[in-house]
Amino acid sequence: MKIPAPSRGGRRGRRDRAAADAPARQVDYRRLRNPFPQMKLYSDDEIAATHDAALTMLEDLGMKILLPEARRIFAAGGARVDEAGEMVRIGREMVAAALDSAPRSVLCRAARPDRDVLLEPGMLVFQPGAGAPHATDLERGRRPGTGSDFRELIKLTQHFDVLQMVPPLVEPQDVPMNLRHYFTMEAQLTLSDKLPFIFSRGTPQVMESFEMLRDFRGCDDAGFMNESHCYTIINTNSPRQIDIPMARGLIDFARHGQLSIVTPFTLMGAMAPISVEAAMTLSHAEALAAITLTQLVRPGAPVCYGTFTSNVDMKSGAPAFGTPEHFRASLAAGQLARVVDRPWRCASGSAANINDSQAANETQFALWGCLMAGATVVIHAAGWLEGGLTVSYEKMVTDMEVLQMVAELCADTAPDNPQVSLDALAEVAPGGHFFAAAHTMARYQTEFYEPLVADWANFGSWTDSGAKTASQRATGIWKDIVSRDAALVHDAARIGAMQDFIAARTAAGGALPES
């Protein structure tokens, strides 16, 4: 085989000429499948024993269910109910029937078909940090969350395709509680075309949010109830309790065909036993109880199994995340989720107070626990600080770098065939370089991931450019994104109708949360 002599000059000119013809790099981050093999921390027998222990807990110890209607529904389904103690004991045959009817695959409808979210085992969906009372950034500092923060963080969530669902992000505390659901719903519908979130804070707020969403999307009642157009997060009150708004949310969302993501929040050593195995028994049982309630309300109602199990600092009681115990609990949750064979939710996160190396280490370690466990939905994957007390604008951006790189690993790529590889090798002589090779020139603009935040410049160039840290570079990125107008086109009549709805409900006093 004749090996051509490598070119020694003209690289810049050839690249400039190629630039005019090269296509823009396009990778689909919207519908990801987890490419990694799922890890097994425990044997199949150990996981089966944990599942059986959870069923025994539900049968013998039971759950405290604070909502009378939920207790009546459980009783009608065959559970043993102690009204005086508000305790419900759920037979394993009830759980088995619920798991049989709960869908294995849920297609959630967004504003556009290319934003729809498919939840089933093997899929991978990311969400940023959710439900924080505070926001922070390098320019304005840490502060109680506001309506302005909420809208800006919606813009950031909308901007990045690797975030497929909109979470509650921060609490807009300058908006009264009786009006807050109008504000958050309007912001989600006008600033994003992704799957929206609705808090379970009582039937009046949920029903009004459903009405806003249904009318804005142009759905009739039947069309709305036959497909999921939104979701809620259901946190049990561990240990072994479901409170009134959470039980109410499970019922309301199931009855109207909307998705509930069940999430026992079990901190080992605090609201859960201190060992991973015992904590996961509790978490699994609580999730099964909530799933069973949804299926008693409406067989086939969309529901997602979930867990959020980590440990606490036993010196202070403060939650810890991104720990070895958090990782182990995620792996155990993945194995238990495969027993029920339904889509499931896990979480990343960090207890760090600022966007520093601790924050990055904890978030990434927890993220890899979710990925190795095979989680369908990974919540708190970007921006989450202080164990959920704060969402950081800069961390939203720096975490996005990691999520996009993970998404790159999920993307389908066509490998070079062996002959192309041999041709590329034959093009360059021993000791030469591939910068100017034809194989390189045909691919260099689209072959590699382009970093969002990372700076690959050498020290001198980095210094000349201001010696900015990753967080400082992230500030410029988020400011640019939130300064732009949302590039969404909405029907003016629907915007007007929604504004009229909000004005009328506001004049009538809104709707207070229920507890």
Per-segment meaning from a language model:
Residues M1-K40, D45-I47, L55-E59, I65-G77, ...:
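N-terminal intrinsically disordered, cationic/polar leader segments
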Residues K2-D16, A20-Y29, L41-H51, L61, ...:
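Catalytic-core signal marking the mid-to-C-terminal active-site face
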Residues F36-M39, K315-F321, G349-N355, G383-K395:
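Short beta-alpha connecting loops at secondary-structure transitions
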Residues E46, L58-I65, G78-V81, L99-V106, ...:
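Structural signal for hydrophobic packing residues in well-ordered secondary-structure cores
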Residues G141-T376:
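Helix-rich catalytic cores of soluble enzyme domains
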Residues G369-T390:
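Glycine-rich phosphate-binding active-site loops on the catalytic face of alpha/beta enzymes
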